[in-house]
Amino acid sequence: MASIKATEISSLIKQQIDQFETTVNVQDVGTVIRVGDGIAFAHGLDNVMAGELLEFSTGVMGMAQNLEEDSVGIIILGPYTDIREGDEVKRTGRIMEVPVGSELLGRVVNPLGQPLDGLGPVHTSKTRPIESPAPGVMARKSVHEPLQTGIKSIDSMIPIGRGQRELIIGDRQTGKTAIAIDTIINQKDQDMICVYVAIGQKESTVSGVVETLRQRGALEYTIVVSASASDPAPLLFLAPYTGVSMAEEFMYNGKHVLVIYDDLSKQAAAYREMSLLLRRPPGREAFPGDVFYLHSRLLERAAKLNDDLGGGSITALPFIETQAGDVSAYIPTNVISITDGQVFLQSDLFHSGVRPAVNPGISVSRVGGSAQIKAMKKVAGTLRLDLAAYRELEAFAQFGSDLDAATQARLNRGERTVELLKQDLHQPLPVEKQVAIIYALTKGYLDDVPVADCRRFESELFTYLESNNNELLEHIRTTGNLPEESDLKAAIEAFKKGFVASNE
């Protein structure tokens, strides 16, 4: 029998000791001390980071918000009814991230990136943090490319550029969501990706929007992020950040994205609810002191990047719901000061049949003018002033009928302008057709057409141009410039000769 030498034994033991590895899995664990209404307070998470993801024993995730001396305030990102006092909550060491990438196109997801459309899981290979710094001054480029909404009153008087933030503001039931849907439909073949964020909407409403987009072939380039009215406040608060994080992935890859937040009033209300439950001190209208920062850090992430970074862009259309047209309330004034202009929708106009109910008097686009195509700039230059003058004269005209010829002509032109700026639901108009009809209007070709026939004149003119002078429309579409004025004039005059008014 072979004997083992003492030296060999010691070297074997030494070898085993050297090879021995132990991994200590240290977990920072806390205990829930209070829970309710989507908020939990936990004790014992001493090293937790602000905004860190935490996991409850039920498997539901939470996010650390209040870091206090003896407890941590946590917003619960999911069903909270199964969480009890005394439950364990542990750190994950990660901050909140959402899945991003082209795999999300055509899908409906919740603010955590989980699918809601019943089409199976979303297989994405990348994630992005929901909070990320906005591009700096040197990373940006001035807005210079147009974003065509397909809505005549907006594209002509309140133009929007790629990389702009344009607020859509108005009372409930004034057609805000309709503008969003029409704008998304109009991005077909425009090399644009759309993200529609529904915050606190009824699930039936979101379902209707998704169905409309599907029927129009617009869902294939759209991501829908939905936090419905039945979801807890923390999910409503997160939804816009999820939407913009998904958009940023495309922007940093040189693509153009349109993000619609419908609407930020509900996000602010959800944030107020969350903050009050977290015992944060209330300010004006019971909103917390940082409600401005809530929206500014979101909307600053919309940008037009410079060419070195790929030249991508995020255009943001935030919605705000006003109460009885009061734009001087807290949240509306905050968002007006953050954005690059606003489109104001008025319920009076809406109910009088002017739809979309855009009030050009107090609507403005601060940077869109430099993005408007030359043809539109040329034909619609005076449209806004003409309309403002008409509204002023309209008030005077009610007092007396003995008006001089020039005033009467202005009133007639104004009536036809208002009529022509009306548009049917989900019928966005290509920019070349908008230019053609606004040219006909501003050059006086509709002055002797009865107001009731203006819309028919418009549709028949488009049919005529498409079949007889399509090269004129093609020229506007491809170059952005007005064709030879004599050609456009001749085409409209030739059409007008054959146009029969209904009273003739």
From Swiss-Prot:
Binding locations of ATP: 170-177
E.C. code: 7.1.2.2
CDD domains per record: ATP-synt_F1_alpha_C, ATP-synt_F1_alpha_N, F1-ATPase_alpha_CD
Subcellular location: Cell membrane
Matches recorded under HAMAP family: ATP_synth_alpha_bact
Entry's Gene Ontology molecular function annotations: ADP binding; ATP binding; proton-transporting ATP synthase activity, rotational mechanism
Family: Belongs to the ATPase alpha/beta chains family.
Keywords linked to the UniProt accession: ATP synthesis, ATP-binding, Cell membrane, CF(1), Hydrogen ion transport, Ion transport, Membrane, Nucleotide-binding, Translocase, Transport
Protein name: ATP synthase subunit alpha
Binding partners and assembly: F-type ATPases have 2 components, CF(1) - the catalytic core - and CF(0) - the membrane proton channel. CF(1) has five subunits: alpha(3), beta(3), gamma(1), delta(1), epsilon(1). CF(0) has three main subunits: a(1), b(2) and c(9-12). The alpha and beta chains form an alternating ring which encloses part of the gamma chain. CF(1) is attached to CF(0) by a central stalk formed by the gamma and epsilon chains, while a peripheral stalk is formed by the delta and b chains.
Catalysed transformations (reactions): ATP + H2O + 4 H(+)(in) = ADP + phosphate + 5 H(+)(out)
This protein's GO CC annotations: plasma membrane; proton-transporting ATP synthase complex
Species name: Shouchella clausii (strain KSM-K16) (Alkalihalobacillus clausii)
Site note Required for activity, residues: 363
Gene responsible for this protein: atpA
Record's function text: Produces ATP from ADP in the presence of a proton gradient across the membrane. The alpha chain is a regulatory subunit.
Keyword Nucleotide-binding: yes
The keyword Lyase is annotated on this UniProt entry: no
Protein's membrane topology: Peripheral membrane protein
